[in-house]
Structures are given as structure tokens and as C-alpha cells.
Amino acid sequence: MAHDVVLIPGDGIGPEITQAMRRVVEATGVQINWNVQEAGAGVMDEFGTPLPQHVLDAVAETKVAIKGPITTPVGTGFRSVNVALRKHFDLYACVRPCLSQPGDGSRFRDVDLVIVRENTEDLYAGFEFDEGAAEVEELSQLVERSGQKTFAADSAISIKPISIAKSRRIVEYAFEYARRCGRKKVTAVHKANIMKATDGLFLRVAREVAANYPDIEFNDKIVDATCMGLVQNPNDFDVLVLPNLY
């Protein structure tokens, strides 16, 4: 039986990569009906958006999509198609296995860890205001009323939402993944020493969730120390769960 799959080739190196992917899939003998849909800068003139509604409808219908890289303008222009897809379909868990391969040239052997990253909130949520916007002035006044020293008048602002519900959802996902896949430890990665309200909330929820999984070891690490640990001894890690920014 053939499977219906949406293919979004993307732009730049995207079409080349997705063509190679199709050859690999064809070599397996699995029958795929490719529903090719275009998104990105190449469709802006025609549809006025990098992610037309008919692309979203196609993905919703098949429930499976493979996407090549899509250009995101730096500092200006349309927002990331990747982020838009994640938010539209509530694709809250970005799961990245990291596994040593023969001949990879790394000085580390037998690396086998999984990064579980929250995909829908934090600074990547896209709540931003340009310098000079009325919202920036309103936020400045709000900060002043709270008794804190406000920011410079010519600032641009990004808002960092971290919620209890979405923190719990991603941490529970990480623990359930660990349990299902025979993993032994979950590490919550954060910057709660500085961002006490937001990352502090994430860490507090992670600790609460961890108490429900006594069969899985839990610890937490500041993101700076995590990065150092990953390059010094990646074998110390198993499953890492972290907010969207990291």
C-alpha cells in the first residue's frame, strides 16, 4: 500500500537534499505518493506569504510531511516557516538523537544522547516589537511602575513566555521517551540563575515532574555548564530537555 506524504522541497540546498532523500526512500521499496508543495521565499510574490494555506491544508490531510531547508531572512522580512509550522500544528517536541557513527572522526566514542527541545514558546514564540513601537513605550512604563530601572528608549523588545502547562508537557514527554526507550537519566537544561522567573519556572516544573518518575535519574544543569560538558564528556548525558531558546 502506498503512503501519502507531503514533500516541501524548500529553497537553497533544499531541493537537492530532498531529491537525494527521495532516492534513498525509493531504494527501500516503500511506496510513497509524494504530494509536492512549495513554501518559502519563492512563493511570496504569488501568495503574499511564505506558507500558503493550501500547504497547511495538505499537511493536515496527510498528517505526514518532509521538509527541506527554507531560507529565513536575517534581521528583517518574513518570519521562519519552520516556526510557523511548529506553532500551527502545535509541534511542541523537537527530538534530536545524537549517535556516534563509524568513521565520524570524533575523539568520542559511543555517544548516544537525545535532545528534547520545547518548540512553541520562549523567545522563539515571535512576540517582538521594533524600536519606536508604541508597545515598547508601554512596556517601558510597566517596568518603571514595577519599581525597576527601565531599558533604553531606543530598544527593540522580545517577550519570553514560559508557561507551567507547556513546561510540564515537554518534561513529561522527555521522561516518557526515556522510559519507553530504556533511557536511564533526564537532564533539565536552563538558565534559572539569571532568568529566575521564566527558566526558574521551567526548572521548578521539571523537578515536580521528575518526582513522578522515580525509576529514572534526574538532574539539572545551567546551559553554560551543559555546553562545556557536551564537548568535554558527552557520554555523561542521556536525555536532555530544554526550553526553546537553547
Name each model feature, range by range.
Residues 45-145, 156-158, 245:
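N-terminal glycine-rich phosphate/adenylate-binding segment common to multiple enzyme folds
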Residues 1-5:
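Extreme N-terminal starter segment of soluble prokaryotic enzymes
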Residues 6, 57-59, 105-109, 149, ...:
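Solvent-exposed alpha-helices and their adjacent loops that cap or buttress functional pockets
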Residues 11-14, 63, 116, 174, ...:
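Buried hydrophobic positions in well-ordered alpha/beta secondary-structure cores of metabolic enzymes
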